[in-house]
């Protein structure tokens, strides 16, 4: 038979062990790294890629057969696409309001209304991709942290991005996925689907990283999945398993960054 004193001693010891274990769990929980919010992740990614410099700078680069210039200053922006480096022969200009104008030898020319939006979208798209993830804090952007996932042994935050109809442009229905490295906040992979021209899905792998005046530029390998609209979250596994078809490389040539210093 167990005595009353022995029983009390047992339960006292048992309670003490339970309390110590509970305190230990609390300490471990408090020491565990906290997952940052999606806004904190995107802010860090933009800062890491040179966002504060991009805010007020002129950026020049060549893409395929055209020359591009982006000027951002005090919240305003002008995107240009030119046929020659000096921007004399033909210059397309897209301003902050979304107005598109084409100049030929410095004189504005008429562009059919049916083509204006197509040209504007083309100019905007090249400039948008050239400085990603800059732009992910635009008012029309909705961001969601899906999870933390490994790709080729590297840990990434997987961020889903969608757009509101108001301010999201003609392609507001497109969906994006960004893979942002958990250690240094670089964007190493991007996937998106689109609805125009019968629609489709693409997966892009960043390579050839360069830092120019504090701004990160990368080129991309552009892949296509076997099916038209697979879940974007499936594409990293398909990439690792060599199930994607390489369509092209997207190369930003000779990028220049000229900071604008306000008076």
Regions found by a protein language model. Give the residues of each.
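N-terminal secretory signal peptides that target proteins for export/translocation
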Residues: 1-13
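N-terminal leader/targeting segments and the immediate start of mature chains
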Residues: 30-67
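Gly/Pro-enriched, hydrophobic low-complexity segments
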Residues: 156-257
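Extended lipid/amphipathic-ligand handling interfaces
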Residues: 45, 70-72, 207-209
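Bacterial N-terminal signal peptides
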Residues: 17-27
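Solvent-exposed N-terminal domain segments of exported/luminal and surface proteins
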Residues: 53-95
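Flexible, processing/modification-adjacent segments and terminal tails
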Residues: 34-40, 101-172, 194-197, 256, ...
């Amino acid at each position: 038979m167990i005595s009353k004193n022995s029983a009390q001693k047992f339960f006292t010891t048992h309670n003490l062990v339970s309390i110590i274990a509970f305190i230990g769990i609390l300490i471990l929980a408090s020491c565990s790294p906290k997952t940052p919010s999606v806004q904190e992740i995107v802010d860090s990614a933009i800062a890491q890629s040179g966002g504060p410099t991009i805010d007020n700078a002129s950026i020049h680069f060549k893409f395929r057969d055209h020359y591009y210039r982006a000027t951002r200053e005090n919240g305003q922006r002008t995107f240009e696409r030119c046929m020659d480096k000096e921007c004399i022969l033909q210059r397309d200009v897209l301003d902050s309001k979304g107005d598109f104008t084409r100049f030929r030898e410095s004189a504005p020319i008429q562009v059919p209304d049916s083509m204006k939006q197509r040209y504007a979208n083309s100019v905007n798209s090249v400039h948008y991709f050239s400085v990603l993830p800059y732009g992910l804090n635009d008012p029309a952007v909705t961001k969601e942290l899906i999870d933390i996932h490994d790709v080729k042994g590297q840990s990434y935050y997987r961020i889903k991005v969608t757009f509101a109809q108001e301010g999201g442009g003609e392609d507001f229905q497109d969906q994006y996925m960004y893979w942002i490295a958990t250690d240094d906040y670089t964007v190493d992979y991007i996937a998106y689907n689109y609805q125009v021209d019968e629609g489709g899905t693409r997966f892009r792998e960043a390579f050839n990283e360069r830092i120019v005046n504090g701004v990160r530029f990368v080129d991309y390998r552009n892949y296509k999945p076997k099916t038209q609209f697979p879940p974007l979250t499936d594409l990293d596994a398909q990439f690792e398993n060599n199930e994607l078809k390489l369509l092209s490389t997207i190369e930003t040539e000779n990028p220049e960054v000229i900071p604008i210093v306000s008076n």
